[in-house]
Amino acid sequence: MVWEVKTNQRPHAVQRLLLVMDERATGVSDSLELLQCNENVPSSPGYNSCDEHMELDDLPELQAVQSDPTQSAIYQLSSDVSHQEYPRPSWSQNTSDIPENTHREDEVDWLTELANIATSPQSPLMQCSFYNRSSPVHIIATSKSLHSYARPPPVSSAKSGPAFPHDHWKEETPVRHERANSESESGIFCMSSLSDDDDLGWCNSWPSTVWHCFLKGTRLCFHKESKKEWQDVEDFARAASCDEEEIQMGTHKGYGSDGLKLLSHEESVSFGESVLKLTFDPGTVEDGLLTVECKLDHPFYVKNKGWSSFYPSLTVVQHGIPCCEIHIGDVCLPPGHPDAINFDDSGVFDTFKSYDFTPMDSSAVYVLSSMARQRRASLSCGGPGTGQEFAGSEFSKSCGSPGSSQLSSSSLYTKAVKSHSSGTVSATSPNKCKRPMNAFMLFAKKYRVEYTQMYPGKDNRAISVILGDRWKKMKNEERRMYTLEAKALAEEQKRLNPDCWKRKRTNSGSQQH
């Protein structure tokens, strides 16, 4: 794979990049050699990294082109970059050159391998205990322990309140200034512009809160007030800051200073958008309860647990914060709370210590893992006979029992394989294939979930009896659609597996003639 820089859209950013590389490259004289990448890419396996070098993911825009095997490779990267497992190199000023033959030469689809990493049974992301931690989980210690995707983005003073101190930007090297200018001109969003020497606290690890632990766009409703009116958190914070003698300020001063305990949650629609409606208890009876409406990806810092969210995959995409799942009874802490500031490294980031992902890679990992977890949970909770008695029936959606989340990853994977292998049309050998569904089975497959919801107290066998009675009462015209579909499936199965109808007799007495 060869990467070339597109210069027609962002010439200024490209020129600046080449200028910086020209100043730092030694022994380069020819104009063609200016395009040679002499830096040690931080995300390349086996390379030591230097903070002064330009990072490859900060280039203006890269486009994949077909390479000519007869030409020399420029900006040539091995196919396993950004997901190769390797020990993290330490940041040092002395970098060593690694021979080019250390790169793997076989072409591997990196996106496919990334999906395999994220959804494999051995993946740490697939462990169910990942979301059921009993020990305290703390998320961020210093930026040295963070990957670029997890570092907070530069905060614009025009959009949100407090920005980073001005002294912080004075400490940046000229190379960092050049990078920042190139990013702003080329429209690139860089999440790694913080210095590696800065200690990140609670406030710098996610977007600024407007009031307590709530972000911009949240709506509040205090139960203690005589008029339970909804108000935007921005308006509430503005009214409280304008006049300390304000009634709201006097009533809600110090509200939930020790955290807000989550009592209930539900999803609702507000102004045409899906939101979470959460009810919190401040811990004091005189303050009363609080109900809020917030976005689905809203992150919360939970006491003795760390960053949590109702939709961790959405939160990591929107805010770059890996989260656990939040549950009823969790205590959400405000910024500045001692339990939210003094913390160690996070077990969440232990998952990524052996992989160096880009922001897009990391988001894909969490999304794929979340999808795979949900699928395996649905495959494993249908009961021992459900998936085998009616192989083609869809999996129950209301099977999330409390004990199902405690199953180990290996047991989930085993059950998923068993359920998947019991499909109607086998893709392996003809000896293991099963007969396709007949007309009644197709009918039962279509209406089983509906009848299960109509009769919640009935088990699977009783539902089958009800479906059979309904099938007997149907007219031939109504059955015709299922009969034609069953014949089509049978013909296709015969074409793919001609020996599917040849039953193998056993020595059991029940099958003796």
Curated annotation (Swiss-Prot):
Ubiquitinated by the CTLH E3 ubiquitin-protein ligase complex, leading to subsequent proteasomal degradation. Highly expressed in liver, adipose tissue, lung, brain, spleen, kidney, skeletal muscle and heart. GO terms for biological process: negative regulation of lipid transport; negative regulation of reactive oxygen species biosynthetic process; negative regulation of transcription by RNA polymerase II; positive regulation of potassium ion transport; regulation of DNA-templated transcription; regulation of transcription by RNA polymerase II; Wnt signaling pathway. Pfam families: AXH, HMG_box. It is found in: Nucleus. Its main location: nucleus. GO terms for cellular component: nucleus. Residues 202-343 form the AXH domain. InterPro entries: Ataxin_AXH_dom, Ataxin_AXH_dom_sf, HBP1, HMG_box_dom, HMG_box_dom_sf. Induction: Up-regulated by insulin in differentiated cultured adipocytes. Residues 165-181 have a biased composition (Basic and acidic residues). Residues 433-501 bind DNA. Keywords: DNA-binding, Nucleus, Repressor, Transcription, Transcription regulation, Ubl conjugation, Wnt signaling pathway. It comes from the Eukaryota. Residues 151-181 are annotated as: Disordered. GO terms for molecular function: DNA-binding transcription factor activity, RNA polymerase II-specific; DNA-binding transcription repressor activity, RNA polymerase II-specific; RNA binding; RNA polymerase II cis-regulatory region sequence-specific DNA binding. PANTHER family: HMG BOX-CONTAINING PROTEIN 1. Binds TCF4. Binds RB1. Binds the second PAH repeat of SIN3A. Transcriptional repressor that binds to the promoter region of target genes. Plays a role in the regulation of the cell cycle and of the Wnt pathway. Binds preferentially to the sequence 5'-TTCATTCATTCA-3'. Binding to the histone H1.0 promoter is enhanced by interaction with RB1. Disrupts the interaction between DNA and TCF4. This is HMG box-containing protein 1. It comes from Rattus norvegicus (Rat). The gene is Hbp1.
